[in-house]
Regions:
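Acidic, low-complexity, intrinsically disordered peripheral segments
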Residues: 1-3, 76, 384-410
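Solvent-exposed loop/turn segments connecting transmembrane beta-strands
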Residues: 79, 271-279
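Transmembrane beta-strand segments that form the barrel wall of outer-membrane beta-barrel proteins
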Residues: 65-74, 262-272
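Bacterial N-terminal signal peptides
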Residues: 9-18
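Residues that define the transmembrane beta-barrel architecture of outer-membrane proteins
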Residues: 87-91, 276-280
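A glycine-/polar-enriched beta->alpha junction
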Residues: 32-42, 49-64, 93-110, 121-128, ...
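Periplasmic alpha-helical coiled-coil/stalk elements that build and connect Gram-negative outer-membrane
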Residues: 2, 25, 126-237, 328-335, ...
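Bacterial Sec-pathway N-terminal export signals of envelope proteins
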Residues: 21-70, 75, 98-99, 107, ...
Length: 410
């Protein structure tokens, strides 16, 4: 309760300007809200904090060891277990310290810093994924709203023309077939509106999953700047993560290679005897690598194999990101061409047909059914154009929001 309340308060403050003015929400505002409330980004930040804290101790020496004991304590005879009767019995206290060379500590620090870099990339990746998913949900919600406007317009047209047909039928200037056809058309329009409302509800639920609120109106997404192929591949989340994994593997291999030189341990102890002089002992422990080719070198070879694996994974990820960019860019270009052709070849003629049918009906030469069909065809053309524009916007978002940015959510 104490953890969730401050986060809810922060979200409420972020939403306050929108809720107070009830202004249409923009894409950038939605992205900012989504990143602030993203739990995946918060989890990634916690991972980065953990790695950062661990890195602070990477180059430190191990803790010293306190050693306390009794040497040469009698175990048999009349003086057994007595610490003050035998001259050889000595109470001892000392301290030992394992020593790591500066090179080893530097290697461990570099490996820890590489791990921090990897976790930082994961924070950026979580924020970028949240922004991309939010932008896609925004596009779906925006175009669902626009499609609903067209569906309601078509329903309004069908209602108008059905009422006009009934009026003509009551005045004996119309016919029942026309009225029945328009009644069926109105029912179809109402069903289409219900279908679009269902789609709008699904899009709104997806939008709420990221932003937490579904406004009545969204601003048009506007132009979306697209990256170059080189920038897309370099900042692709998978490629960036693989680059960090490669760096971690290299640093880890360096740490393992440094273990071929053993760590020395020095020790100093003070011994107290009864009736005799106290003593001081000083010593150094040096591990002896008796078979480095079968132990230390094997460990290093294992780590170097992981470096090679990371290099191959990075190369494969770069190829996949390049193919992904080219596929999305090709889809975007084809959609742009289709939109231009469809607008010129279908939408404009459909509008001209509606104008001609309206003029013909006004002059008494055309029928209400012909007018409705012309209006319906124009609205359908506009809905198809909206679908193409939505697909283009979603493709552009995949291109623009997939790569990592320098901005990391606070």
């Amino acid at each position: 309760m104490s953890i969730l309340f401050p986060r809810a308060a922060v979200l409420a403050v972020a939403l306050l300007p929108y809720l107070a003015t009830a202004a249409p929400l923009s894409l950038e505002e939605a992205l900012a809200i989504a990143v602030k409330r993203s739990e995946s980004t918060r989890a990634a930040r916690a991972g980065a904090l953990s790695a950062t804290e661990a890195a602070h101790s990477a180059a430190q020496l191990p803790d010293p060891t306190l050693r306390v004991g009794i040497d040469n304590l009698p175990a048999t005879g009349p003086d057994r277990f007595r610490t003050t009767r035998d001259s050889m019995t000595m109470k001892r206290i000392g301290i030992s310290q394992e020593w790591l060379s500066a090179d080893k500590r530097a290697a461990r620090q570099a490996a820890a810093d590489a791990a921090v870099g990897r976790e930082t990339v994961l924070v950026q990746a979580a924020a970028a994924d949240t922004r991309r998913q939010t932008a896609l949900a925004y596009i779906d919600a925006f175009y669902a709203n626009e499609s609903l406007k067209l569906a309601k317009l078509m329903e309004h047209h069908a209602h108008e023309e059905l009422e006009a047909s009934r009026a003509r039928l009551s005045s004996a200037t119309g016919n029942s077939q026309e009225a029945l056809a328009l009644a069926s058309a109105r029912g179809t329009s109402e069903d289409e509106t219900a279908d679009v409302l269902q789609q709008q509800g699904a899009a709104g639920a997806a939008f709420q999953r990221w932003v937490g609120v579904m406004p009545d109106e969204l601003q048009p997404p506007g132009a979306i700047a697209l990256p170059t192929e080189e920038a897309y591949v370099a900042a692709h989340p998978t490629v960036s993560a693989m680059q960090r994994d490669l760096e971690v593997a290299r640093r880890t291999a360096a740490v393992t290679a440094s273990d071929r030189k053993p760590n020395w341990t020095w020790e100093i102890a003070y011994g107290q005897r009864t009736g005799y002089s106290d003593m001081v002992s000083v010593g150094v422990s040096i591990p002896l690598p008796v078979a480095p080719g079968e132990r230390q070198d094997r460990d290093t070879a294992a780590k170097l194999a992981l470096v090679e694996k990371a290099e191959a994974d990075l190369a494969e990820a770069s190829r996949a990101a390049t193919a992904e960019y080219r596929s999305l860019r090709s889809d975007a270009q084809r959609l742009e061409q289709r939109i231009d052709r469809y607008r010129t070849g279908v939408v404009v003629p459909a509008g001209q047909r509606t104008a001609a049918a309206t003029a013909s009906y006004s002059s008494g030469q055309g029928s209400l059914v012909s007018l409705f069909e012309a209006r319906h065809a124009e609205v359908e053309a506009q809905r198809k154009l909206l679908t193409l524009q939505r697909d283009l916007a979603k493709t552009q978002i995949q291109l623009a929001f997939r790569p990592l940015t320098a901005e990391v959510a606070q």
